[in-house]
Amino acid sequence: MSRYRGPRLKKIRRLGALPGLTRKTPKSGSNQKKKFHSGKKEQYRIRLQEKQKLRFHYGLTERQLLRYVHIAGKAKRSTGQVLLQLLEMRLDNILFRLGMASTIPGARQLVNHRHILVNGRIVDIPSFRCKPRDIITTKDNQRSKRLVQNYIASSDPGKLPKHLTVDTLQYKGLVKKILDRKWVGLKINELLVVEYYSRQT
């Protein structure tokens, strides 16, 4: 299944706020009428909805998300929390959380077009996994800096998660540590996502 490129408002009306996909938020009461199902069908619908929220927020294909679930499942810690940490430490998401892009798709374009350096080296893979002490910067040219300056200047410092720091004058971000669960940028029940996939096997 390919990455979603359709109307973004359609998705947030159905799933709720997806800040990684769009800055827009659903209007109160704009959700579609809920169809009430009984028992197993309703439980399945809720699990599916949480899975879709995760997928569209981080801009993943179904195959990519499934791969992350498998990797998280091999860890000794909580599968759900490891899954969120893996997704949050992707380079495209780190750029978004630093305020260098307005959305994750926007951050992905910066990476794909080779505007971003990690520890002084160009990285053009959006899924690149960042780690503590990584330094993220733009290339030292006017075009690269211009692409992020408006976003980074208008970003809200209060929304910057505690595992990151940003220097808005030098267009530079630092990953201080692996994030805590409470700093995940999406309202999500990750256990339902893990449950969804465990029932597919």
From Swiss-Prot:
Residues 89-150 form the S4 RNA-binding domain. One of its GO terms (biological process) is translation. Transmembrane segments: none annotated. CDD domains: S4. One of its GO terms (molecular function) is rRNA binding. The keyword RNA-binding applies. GO terms for cellular component: chloroplast; small ribosomal subunit. Its main location: plastid. It is found in: Plastid, Chloroplast. Residues 15-43 are annotated as: Disordered. Part of the 30S ribosomal subunit. Contacts protein S5. The interaction surface between S4 and S5 is involved in control of translational fidelity. PANTHER family: 30S 40S RIBOSOMAL PROTEIN (PTHR11831), SMALL RIBOSOMAL SUBUNIT PROTEIN US4M (PTHR11831:SF4). NCBIfam families: PRK05327.1, rpsD_bact. Belongs to the universal ribosomal protein uS4 family. This is Small ribosomal subunit protein uS4c.
